[in-house]
Amino acid sequence: MASPGTTPSFSPAQLAGLSLPSSCSKTANDVIAFSNSYTGNAFRQTMIKTWQDEAEAAQAAGCIKGYKILNTAENTATEQIAQIQSLLLTGVKAIDIDSASPTALNGVIEQACSQGITVVVFDSLASTKCEYDLGDDIPVISTEMAQGMAQLMGGQGNMMIVRGLVGTETELPKYQAQLDVLKNYPNIKVVATVTGQSSEAIAESAVAAELPSLPQIDGVLTAGGGDSMGVVAAYQNAHMTVPPVALDNSGQALQFWSQSIPSGYKTVSIGAQPGVASAAFWETLDLLNGAKGIPKLMQAPPIPITPDSISQWEAVTPASNIATYLYTLAETNQLIQANYGGGPLPLPPVPTSAP
């Protein structure tokens, strides 16, 4: 991947079929909607705020007439389908979707496309041919998280795995990628696997229920989606030493890590960025304004946080948020160019202020 803040350059030949609009004049009277399938963790809550902030900025600039946001609380596909069906009756020109299922929403998405509505699915994807997808680089996130935790454990010891939001498009590939890494460490024994549903409260309860029956845990590999501090809380409430826990880039987790560094605590933190919602918004606006050649499937880079950068990220990440970066239209277009041209994905710089 490119270094943070760099922009890949491409030749005209590499970008010959890509055409991005220079204005948003075509969408001044349009209403854009966002359908989100889950609100139970800081990642999704940060994502909702990110998308809304960009929509409000676009509305203030005269790029859109208005926007709508509909949320389902518990990742229920049937409820999300009903909400999208209601949007189809309101005259929206585009719908951005964070999907409850890789397949269950396909019918209603195809219905939207048949009505001429532009559909961009991001973070947790669906699988129709008509949608545009902006996903997270799951192999990189999961592989680096598992690799980092295995190395912290010295390649041996007892591990607990905390799975994420089971049923979404990203969870099973993430879990499988972690298991693939662990195959290279035969002296690491997975002694417990629990489901945290990417929720701090659910992860805390699930881990707390297992701790009395477990041997010493030398590392906890989480899903990195809003559950890590639930694991930490379970150990703290049990008055047990917190082992290395793969953190999820939440402000609360970064504060915990920063405060624990003087005592020698080590961990790994890399995660998808909820700011992908801002890139999805601007991609949608590009499409509505006549963009040509945007790939149907694109990826956004994760945010790795290290001991060298934690103080910077902690300073701009409120406790209730996830470390993220708000993409501008120009930066979204750079991301589109990188995906189109096959170059490295540009990592966002550390923001200078909280989103």
Model-derived segments and spans:
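A residue-level marker of the well-folded mature domains of exported/periplasmic proteins
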Residues: 1-355
